[in-house]
């Protein structure tokens, strides 16, 4: 899966073009406006560089490996995939990482670069529309974005 392009092969001009949308089901511009923020690498970079934020998430996952070991995990809004990667490194049996934007393509590359492609599956979808092949034991999410 690659980033969307226009007829000339250029990347999208509008932020909302970076979001996987099904206009027949979701006709609300607020949906696109919410997700467009997280669809760009520079926004992900800003969040990853926030030391307090990352330490809090890191400690919550990495200091509690028993919560993940052998479990099936759902990462809602995976973004860069960092929580999914940490869950896999803590021994999760399978991690389904759901991302509504084309950031999913970058997350997949990061997962593969960390040798975790057999454990972490990136699913480009909204959480409302994703169909998981099995029930999960643990749900994780960076639901606070910039507000932690």
Predicted regions and their residues:
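Intrinsically disordered, low-complexity glycine/charged-rich regulatory or linker segments
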Residues: 1-45, 65
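Conserved alpha-helix/loop element of class I SAM-dependent methyltransferases that forms part
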Residues: 52-71
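Conserved class I S-adenosyl-L-methionine
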Residues: 71-77
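Conserved SAM-binding loop of SAM-dependent methyltransferases across substrates and taxa
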Residues: 80-93
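Conserved SAM-binding motif I beta-strand of class I
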Residues: 94-99
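Conserved short alpha-helix immediately C-terminal to the canonical SAM/SAH-binding motif I
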Residues: 102-106
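S-adenosyl-L-methionine
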Residues: 107-133
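A short SAM/SAH-binding and catalytic strip from SAM-dependent methyltransferases
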Residues: 137-148
């Amino acid at each position: 899966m690659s980033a969307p392009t226009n007829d000339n092969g250029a990347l999208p001009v509008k932020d909302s073009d970076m979001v996987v949308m099904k206009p027949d089901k979701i006709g609300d511009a607020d949906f696109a406006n919410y997700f467009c923020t997280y669809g760009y690498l520079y926004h992900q970079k800003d969040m990853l560089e926030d030391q307090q934020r990352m330490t809090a998430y890191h400690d919550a996952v990495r200091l509690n490996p028993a919560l993940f070991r052998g479990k099936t995990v759902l990462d809602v809004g995976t973004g860069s995939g960092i929580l999914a990667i940490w869950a896999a490194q803590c021994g999760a049996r399978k991690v389904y990482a759901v991302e509504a934007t084309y950031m999913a393509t970058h997350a997949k590359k990061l997962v593969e670069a960390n040798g975790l492609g057999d454990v972490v599956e990136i699913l480009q979808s909204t959480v409302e529309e994703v169909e998981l092949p099995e029930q999960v034991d643990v749900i994780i999410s960076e639901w606070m974005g910039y507000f932690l």
